[in-house]
């Protein structure tokens, strides 16, 4: 079983960005390669009216995967749109101007291979937040036959 090593010379965060580093629990090489995926979900916590919060918001953006030369360690660079897009349903008759804070995620957050050998290193805008999901399946699915 492999364990997280922070040996690679990851680049420093650029101006206006921050670097987030976290480790994934080892699950065994076979399980990590065949059954698990990591989903990075960057976004921003935005203040909005109760009416707007009842609608579905999303941020445009992208996640680029890079490799630290000579180490094989991966890192990710996030670009996020400044403005969220939203559905426009009218929900509350009396909004009263109340403001709420809501996490708005990047649309179509991609999945990446689960690798506990190295830490997960993500560069994103300073005003952004990173959440993540770990997806693990069981045994391989089989096709149904007639």
UniProtKB/Swiss-Prot annotation:
Pfam entry (one): Ecotin
Superkingdom to which the source organism belongs: Eukaryota
GO molecular function, one term: serine-type endopeptidase inhibitor activity
SUPFAM superfamilies: Ecotin, trypsin inhibitor (SSF49772)
Similarity comment: Belongs to the protease inhibitor I11 (ecotin) family.
PANTHER family named in the record: ECOTIN (PTHR35890:SF3), PTHR35890
Protein name (Swiss-Prot/TrEMBL): Ecotin-like protein 1
């Amino acid at each position: 079983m492999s364990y997280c090593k922070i040996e690679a010379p990851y680049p420093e965060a650029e101006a206006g960005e921050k670097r987030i580093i976290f480790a994934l629990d080892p699950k065994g090489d076979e399980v990590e390669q065949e059954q698990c995926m990591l989903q990075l979900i960057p976004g921003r916590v935005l203040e909005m009216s109760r009416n707007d919060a009842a609608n579905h918001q999303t941020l445009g953006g992208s996640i680029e995967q890079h490799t630290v030369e000579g180490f094989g360690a991966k890192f990710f660079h996030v670009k996020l749109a400044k403005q969220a897009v939203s559905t426009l349903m009218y929900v509350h008759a009396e909004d009263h101007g109340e403001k709420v804070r809501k996490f708005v995620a990047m649309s179509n957050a991609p999945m990446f291979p689960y690798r506990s050998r190295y830490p997960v290193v993500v560069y994103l805008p300073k005003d952004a937040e990173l959440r993540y999901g770990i997806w693990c399946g069981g045994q391989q699915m089989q096709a149904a036959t007639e």
